Amino acid sequence: GVRAKHLTTTAKKPHPYEYAHDEVGYNYRLPNLNAALGCAQLEQLESFIAQKRDLASRYAAQLKGSELDFFSEPVGCRSNYWLNAVLCENLHHRDALLKATNDNGVMTRPVWALMNHLPMYSNCRCGPLTNAEWLEARIVNLPSSIPLEARK
């Protein structure tokens, strides 16, 4: 029924841009068609990574000198840039950026909520998460998909 569908689709609450889950959910679905598609996509993996790295490079160039810090790969590492993100000055700035971008058709999202902030884990023991909470209040995920027209 409805509850089973909710649980098997990660128990995400409907929202235009936030990832909020109201209970423990699962993502156990992989129909044969999806598995076949995954195999076909693997053949194009290096091309996809090159395109994602190009997108990240363009984000970094556009954001250089701005008040946003773009997350780029550490020296000596090679990122696949599956997700591009920026660090805002504070929570107020993060929320203003999220509103402005989404209001203008750019689907940015806040970083995922810390597990201890989710209702189903709110009573679990947790130590201090000062750094994680600082980051949670400041990170915005940028659109990171490869445009369909570039996947040729």
Which residue ranges define each predicted feature?
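PLP-dependent aminotransferase class I/II
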Residues: 2-152
